[in-house]
Amino acid sequence: MGHVTDIRSNSQGFNLTDSVYERLLSERIIFLGSEVNDNIANRLCAQILLLAAEDAFKDISLYINSPGGSISAGMAIYDTMVLAPCDIATYAMGMAASMGEFLLAAGTRGKRYALPHARILMHQPLGGVTGSAADIAIQAEQFAVIKKEMFRLNAEFTGQPIERIEADSDRDRWFTASEALEYGFVDHIITRAHVNGEVQ
């Protein structure tokens, strides 16, 4: 029969049976490590609101390794980030694609980071339409509105002209960390984090 090893730290009181994500949350670190869907959005929104209520002035760190996902779910996360009174630092690790890119760039200006080998993908919002001809027309109209708004916000986040955002989003556009820095998705490339929370 196997057994669980319980290793405790005298300074932190941390043991291997603790939930990693709960431990990170206690340090004001939240993690988007999957496709963006309603369940993930509800969890992240709740975590942001909780941390903002606990301390309205201390930063929240959002780490992103995501292929993207639902536009409505992603916009719920974005609106909650804007609602929070504290700064939200964003970190790209692995892949920040589509809605992952959007949330990365939506972080507090000056506090958006990429790890050296992170990859960032920008493209047009994707959305399928079904139903009757009238329903399809309504959905297509709404999708056009959302697409225009996301182009506008990405232009605001990056400082790029909206015309360039539209042109570069026409097809999948991948960025290295250095290219993402130059484009304006992030403000820093980091290689090391210190115990006190500072980054290099």
Curated annotation (Swiss-Prot):
GO process terms (BP): protein quality control for misfolded or incompletely synthesized proteins
Residues annotated as catalytic: 98 (nucleophile), 123
Recorded GO MF terms: ATP-dependent peptidase activity; ATPase binding; serine-type endopeptidase activity
Annotated EC: 3.4.21.92
Reactions it catalyzes: Hydrolysis of proteins to small peptides in the presence of ATP and magnesium. alpha-casein is the usual test substrate. In the absence of ATP, only oligopeptides shorter than five residues are hydrolyzed (such as succinyl-Leu-Tyr-|-NHMec, and Leu-Tyr-Leu-|-Tyr-Trp, in which cleavage of the -Tyr-|-Leu- and -Tyr-|-Trp bonds also occurs)
Location(s), subcellular: Cytoplasm
Enzyme class: hydrolase
InterPro entries on file: ClpP, ClpP/crotonase-like_dom_sf, ClpP/TepA, ClpP_His_AS
Top-level taxonomic group: Bacteria
SUPFAM superfamilies according to UniProt: ClpP/crotonase (SSF52096)
Main location: cytoplasm
Pfam family, one: CLP_protease
Keyword tags: Cytoplasm, Hydrolase, Protease, Serine protease
NCBIfam families assigned to the protein according to its UniProt record, in alphabetical order: PRK00277.1, PRK12553.1
Subunit relationships: Fourteen ClpP subunits assemble into 2 heptameric rings which stack back to back to give a disk-like structure with a central cavity, resembling the structure of eukaryotic proteasomes.
Protein name, as recorded: ATP-dependent Clp protease proteolytic subunit 1
Organism, as annotated: Mycobacterium leprae (strain TN)
